[in-house]
Structure formats: structure tokens, C-alpha cells
Amino acid sequence: GAVFPVPEIQQAAFLPYILPLCRPSFLVLTGHDRADGTSSLHTQAFCRSVRAARLYEPDPERLVIFAGACSSRAEDILKAGANFASSPGRIPISVLDPVLLALAASAVSPGRRIEPSRIIAATLCGPAGIAAAPN
């Protein structure tokens, strides 16, 4: 897989150019976020990025998306179209959690359904740090 370090607020603009070139089956959109009262600093940027990725591939089975960071509003990111999001408990997640999630999801055989609870169990923070879209 390819890694492109793009600031959170620029990810949505970057995706239309890079997704057709890479044609990923799994996309990780992360960075930094922090709770600021009732909102989070970059949650809306992650939501815009998820919507941009869904314009490229609307099928959540063909493009699995993880988005968010520490203290992100997972419910907003899931509504935007992500399969997985952080952080439902508004906790700091491990820097390894997006990687562990991607590894666990990529280990699922093609044509088999990803079981969200099994994928989330593979992360360090578990359900307090990672949420899955409802089936």
C-alpha cells in the first residue's frame, strides 16, 4: 500500500487525484483531532474526505474506509460514509489502531464479509476507540 502524508484539511481535495491512480480497497484517513467543547478540530475535514472517497467508490464493500483520530466525532464520520471511525469514546487512540484495523480487514478473504466486532477487537483501544458503521 501507498502512504501519502497529507494534512487533514487537504485530504478531501487530494483524494480525487490519487484514488484513481492507486485504486485501493482500503483507505485510512487519519491525522490529529482534539475535542474543543462540543466539536472536534478536524472531524468535519475527515467527513469531507470520506464523502470525496465515496464519490470515487460508493460501495462500502469495495472500498473500506477508516477515518478519524483522537477525540474525533465517530458518529459524524460514519454518517459521512466511513466503514470504521474513531473515537466514539472521545479518547486518544493508539497510533497503531488504524494500522491494526487495516491489517485485520485486509486479512479477510475476497468475497467474505468483514465482521466489524472481530476487526475492532484487533485494535488496542477496542470499541471505546473505534466504531463500525451499522450493517
Where are the regions a protein language model picked out?
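Well-ordered alpha-helical segments embedded in enzymatic catalytic cores
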Residues: 13-14, 45, 49
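Metallocofactor- and cofactor-centric catalytic cores in central/energy metabolism, strongly enriched
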Residues: 1-6, 14-15, 19
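Proline-aspartate-enriched helix->loop->beta-strand connector
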Residues: 19-29, 82
